[in-house]
Amino acid sequence: MTYPSFTSGEVLTAADMNAVGLWLVKTQTVGTAVSSVTVTGAFSSTYDNYLITLEGGTVSADGDINLKLGASATGYYGFLNYGDVASATPLGATRNNTAQFNWVGGGAAGQRAHVHVQVFGPNKAAYTKLLNGTYQSGSNYGTIQGEHRVATAYTDFTLATGTGTLTGGTIRVYGYKNGLS
């Protein structure tokens, strides 16, 4: 399979553009020493599924980064499979009807913050699925899967620290193309 490659000034055809599967929908810069960042206008009916990333910037303390859809503060369920680099024992943790998706990212004190999570159907009036959140808190690493069991369509989300603050970095929201049309 060949992948599209574009040059400055080139006329792009529908065939060229239809080959692109992931579209950058929104970017937002994180401020200085903030405990949360709300990203508005991130989800729409144009895309069913999304990838959310946060790269760069730093966290002030070991801890996770959490995600909330719109203003919904209930109905979040999930399971975290994780481990500590000093132990070979796998660990698990659950969330049952909590106020947010925990563990979608994180970092170690003074180091880079990160989020990388897939969100399925946030703009549909149905349950929203969350897959492959990349958790870190100090030397603990893991992956979360979850579901938001509130049948509401959302356009916005908030990323928040579990402890400490975020400084700098960029949140990017990508929409997965719905088909070849």
Functional labels for PLM-detected ranges:
Residues 2-181:
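Surface-exposed molecular-recognition determinants
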